[in-house]
UniProtKB/Swiss-Prot annotation:
Keyword Cell membrane among record annotations: no
Similarity comment: Belongs to the herpesviridae US12 family.
Pfam families registered for this protein in UniProt: Herpes_US12
Region entry Disordered, spans: 33-88
Species of origin: Human herpesvirus 1 (strain 17) (HHV-1)
Biological role stated in the UniProt entry: Plays a role in the inhibition of host immune response. Binds specifically to transporters associated with antigen processing (TAP), thereby blocking peptide-binding and translocation by TAP as well as subsequent loading of peptides onto MHC class I molecules. Empty MHC I molecules are retained in the endoplasmic reticulum and ultimately directed to proteasomal degradation. In consequence, infected cells are masked for immune recognition by cytotoxic T-lymphocytes.
Primary residence: host cell
Basic and acidic residues: bias regions: 33-51
Domain notes: The N-terminal active domain blocks peptide binding to and peptide transport by TAP.
GO biological processes: symbiont-mediated perturbation of host microtubule cytoskeleton; symbiont-mediated suppression of host antigen processing and presentation of peptide antigen via MHC class I
Location(s), subcellular: Host cytoplasm; Host nucleus
Polar residues composition bias: residue spans: 76-88
Lineage: Viruses, Duplodnaviria, Heunggongvirae, Peploviricota, Herviviricetes
Protein name: ICP47 protein
Length: 88
């Protein structure tokens, strides 16, 4: 649901039910937080969305695969820090 539709729906619900209490708002925020965390867990483990997996789960990328290879953005050598270039 788009943000505008969701806000309109929330507004209409508020008008129907009346003013909400602090506890109602707190419960709604906690509920949305739980839903967001669950959606994030599902997205990480969903095989249909491989780009959302954490880097440790991608088999084709080794942790030190880029060391000693030309830097992709600048075309120069890979550096450990700007002042300490890696020479290999």
């Amino acid at each position: 649901m788009s943000w505008a539709l969701e806000m309109a729906d929330t507004f209409l619900d508020t008008m129907r039910v009346g003013p909400r209490t602090y506890a109602d708002v707190r419960d709604e925020i906690n509920k949305r937080g739980r839903e967001d965390r669950e959606a994030a867990r599902t997205a990480v483990h969903d095989p249909e969305r491989p780009l959302l997996r954490s880097p440790g789960l991608l088999p084709e990328i080794a942790p030190n695969a880029s060391l000693g290879v030309a830097h992709r953005r600048t075309g120069g050598t890979v550096t450990d820090s700007p002042r300490n270039p890696v020479t290999r």
